[in-house]
Design a protein with these regions (language model features):
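Positively charged, small/polar-rich N-terminal and surface patches that mediate targeting and assembly
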Residues: 1-108
């Protein structure tokens, strides 16, 4: 059994969660944030048997779109009164997936 932690954009969570459930893959959503854009993320905790790992990863790829946004402070440097914001186009989205081996689990 594998445990996946998939960090995705909030915009992708509804479609991805629905698609995983359609493949009979259980999902737990955890709200998270981070990255230099400080945008809202969702971390999905997904437990899958080894034989469904490829299906889970392909589903995550299909439903975690990359897109460009324009941000005023893409550098991550805090603004101060004297600073000037320069709009920059930044690619966001996609997924970061951590795959862990599950030694054992049980349900109560």
């Amino acid at each position: 059994m594998k445990l996946l932690f998939a960090i995705i954009q909030n915009d992708d969570k509804k479609a991805l969660t629905r698609a995983l459930i359609e493949h009979d893959i259980s999902v737990t959503q955890i709200s998270s944030s981070g990255g230099f854009l400080r945008g809202g993320n969702t971390t999905l905790m997904i437990g899958v048997p080894k034989e469904k790992l490829d299906v889970a990863l392909e589903t995550i790829k299909e439903h975690s779109s990359r897109r460009k946004i324009v941000t005023a402070n893409a550098t991550g440097i805090p603004h101060n009164v004297d600073s000037v914001s320069i709009p920059m186009s930044v690619t966001v989205g996609g997924a970061t997936v951590f795959i862990l081996e599950v030694e054992d689990f049980f349900r109560c």
